[in-house]
Protein backbone atom coordinates (compact mmCIF):
# COMPACT_ATOMS: atom_id res chain seq x y z
CA UNK A 1 0.00 0.00 0.00
CA UNK A 2 1.16 3.55 -0.73
CA UNK A 3 -0.12 6.68 1.04
CA UNK A 4 -0.21 9.85 -1.06
CA UNK A 5 -0.27 13.38 0.32
CA UNK A 6 -1.32 16.11 -2.12
CA UNK A 7 -0.59 19.62 -0.83
CA UNK A 8 -1.96 22.51 -2.91
CA UNK A 9 -1.21 26.11 -1.94
CA UNK A 10 -0.93 29.74 -2.90
CA UNK A 11 1.63 32.12 -1.44
CA UNK A 12 1.10 35.62 -0.10
CA UNK A 13 2.79 38.49 -1.90
CA UNK A 14 6.48 39.05 -1.18
CA UNK A 15 7.28 35.85 0.75
CA UNK A 16 8.94 33.81 -2.00
CA UNK A 17 12.54 33.95 -0.71
CA UNK A 18 11.71 33.03 2.89
CA UNK A 19 9.29 30.37 1.69
CA UNK A 20 11.89 28.78 -0.61
CA UNK A 21 14.34 28.48 2.27
CA UNK A 22 11.81 26.61 4.43
CA UNK A 23 10.60 24.50 1.48
CA UNK A 24 14.15 23.37 0.71
CA UNK A 25 14.67 22.45 4.36
CA UNK A 26 11.45 20.37 4.31
CA UNK A 27 12.42 18.74 1.00
CA UNK A 28 15.61 17.50 2.67
CA UNK A 29 13.93 16.53 5.97
CA UNK A 30 11.16 14.39 4.46
CA UNK A 31 13.78 12.22 2.76
CA UNK A 32 15.00 11.15 6.22
CA UNK A 33 11.62 9.64 7.15
CA UNK A 34 11.62 5.85 7.11
CA UNK A 35 9.01 4.90 4.52
CA UNK A 36 9.38 8.02 2.35
CA UNK A 37 9.15 7.01 -1.32
CA UNK A 38 9.29 10.16 -3.44
CA UNK A 39 8.03 13.69 -3.94
CA UNK A 40 7.19 15.97 -6.87
CA UNK A 41 6.58 19.71 -7.10
CA UNK A 42 4.53 21.57 -9.68
CA UNK A 43 3.78 25.26 -10.20
CA UNK A 44 0.74 26.20 -12.28
CA UNK A 45 0.63 29.27 -14.51
CA UNK A 46 -1.88 30.87 -12.13
CA UNK A 47 0.48 30.54 -9.14
CA UNK A 48 -1.00 27.46 -7.50
CA UNK A 49 1.68 25.14 -6.12
CA UNK A 50 1.22 21.39 -5.86
CA UNK A 51 3.43 19.04 -3.86
CA UNK A 52 2.83 15.30 -4.05
CA UNK A 53 4.58 13.13 -1.46
CA UNK A 54 4.32 9.34 -1.37
CA UNK A 55 4.94 7.15 1.67
CA UNK A 56 5.14 3.38 2.08
CA UNK A 57 2.32 3.27 4.65
CA UNK A 58 0.19 5.27 7.10
CA UNK A 59 2.80 5.05 9.87
CA UNK A 60 5.39 6.68 7.60
CA UNK A 61 3.00 9.46 6.64
CA UNK A 62 2.11 10.03 10.29
CA UNK A 63 5.81 10.25 11.25
CA UNK A 64 6.16 13.04 8.72
CA UNK A 65 3.00 14.81 9.85
CA UNK A 66 4.34 14.83 13.42
CA UNK A 67 8.01 15.54 12.61
CA UNK A 68 9.04 18.56 14.77
CA UNK A 69 10.61 20.74 12.06
CA UNK A 70 7.66 19.96 9.76
CA UNK A 71 5.24 21.08 12.49
CA UNK A 72 7.19 24.34 12.81
CA UNK A 73 7.13 24.82 9.02
CA UNK A 74 3.35 24.28 9.07
CA UNK A 75 2.97 26.95 11.74
CA UNK A 76 5.10 29.40 9.76
CA UNK A 77 3.17 28.56 6.62
CA UNK A 78 -0.13 29.53 8.22
CA UNK A 79 1.28 32.65 9.88
CA UNK A 80 3.68 33.92 7.19
CA UNK A 81 3.50 32.25 3.78
CA UNK A 82 0.15 30.90 2.61
CA UNK A 83 -2.88 32.81 1.45
CA UNK A 84 -4.61 29.44 0.94
CA UNK A 85 -3.85 25.72 1.12
CA UNK A 86 -5.56 22.36 0.82
CA UNK A 87 -4.24 18.96 1.92
CA UNK A 88 -5.53 15.59 0.77
CA UNK A 89 -4.11 12.33 2.13
CA UNK A 90 -5.28 9.07 0.62
CA UNK A 91 -4.39 5.46 -0.07
CA UNK A 92 -3.27 4.56 -3.56
CA UNK A 93 -5.65 1.84 -4.71
CA UNK A 94 -4.24 1.21 -8.16
CA UNK A 95 -1.22 2.37 -10.09
CA UNK A 96 -0.34 2.05 -13.76
CA UNK A 97 2.80 3.14 -15.53
CA UNK A 98 3.80 3.36 -19.19
CA UNK A 99 7.23 4.05 -20.58
CA UNK A 100 8.13 4.23 -24.26
CA UNK A 101 11.71 3.23 -24.92
CA UNK A 102 13.15 3.88 -28.35
CA UNK A 103 15.55 1.32 -29.74
CA UNK A 104 19.00 2.70 -30.54
What is each of the regions a protein language model found here?
Residues 1-49, 58-66, 82-104:
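Short S/T/G/P-rich N-terminal loop/turn motif that feeds into the first structured element of a domain
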